[in-house]
Amino acid sequence: LGLTINMNQLRPNKLSDILGQKQVVEVLNINIKSAKSRSDCLAHTLFYGPPGTGKTTLANAIANEMGCSLQIANGANLRTIKNLLPYVMRVEDHSILFIDEIHRMTNIVEEFLYPVMADFKVDMSISGKEIFGETLSIDIPRFTLMGATTEYGSLSKPLIDRFQHKHTLKLYNKVELQEIVNINSKKLNLKMSDKASVFVTKVSRGTPRIANAALEWLRDYRIAQGSETLSE
């Protein structure tokens, strides 16, 4: 019966489709317009705020607005330079590398990123009988590093300073979240009573991710039960 859905189908593809985070979206639109007018990549950007408030969604939407490729990595998996290097070497001109949970990178990986972010260069130590200890510097395309964190206080000042744009994401208010619930329930072909819709909004605790997960479960439940409309 296909009881599950790709939750990416519920994710907005453009900034204009994003509900909530109004001030952040307004500033991002300005940044994007400026970058595109200069035929340049977006400046390095950091998002911080509670889990599930749209950091990855914003990265996807920005990539679509910029018309560029997007790579997604998780800081928890970037323990060594070897872990990070494939992502860095695959960046394209004006592309985006998004690192979620960037606060979980190790210090050695963070320090490796400094020249990458500042000069778009990869500095690698090389060894050999005649060149032991020398450093090879490789130019890479200009790209945007995006970081996302729920723990801003865990980031070092040198790393924070290398992000030209910093945006705080907040929990969604009831009106914004209610609208998200109403829109996404229609995408899932899920008919709910007003009371059921309000209940989903309430239990989602200001977080679209929780709301979408609840809607998916309710969609599956409705199909399994064979009911048309869900009430509270």
Question: Where are the predicted features?
Answer:
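Pre-Walker A (pre-P-loop) alpha-helix and adjacent loop at the N terminus of AAA/AAA+ ATPase modules
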Residues: 6-44, 85, 89
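Residues at the beta-strand->loop junction immediately N-terminal to the Walker
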Residues: 19, 46-48, 99
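Walker A/P-loop
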Residues: 33-75, 87-92
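Conserved AAA+/SF3 P-loop NTPase catalytic/coupling segment centered on the Walker-B
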Residues: 61-62, 81, 95-125, 152-162
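Short beta-strand-centered segment that lines the nucleotide-binding/catalytic pocket of NTP-utilizing
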Residues: 70-81, 127
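AAA+/SF3 P-loop NTPase mechanochemical coupling elements
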Residues: 128-148
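Conserved AAA+ ATPase core "coupling" helix
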Residues: 154-187, 194-199, 213
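C-terminal helical "lid" of AAA+/P-loop NTPase domains
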Residues: 198-202, 209-224
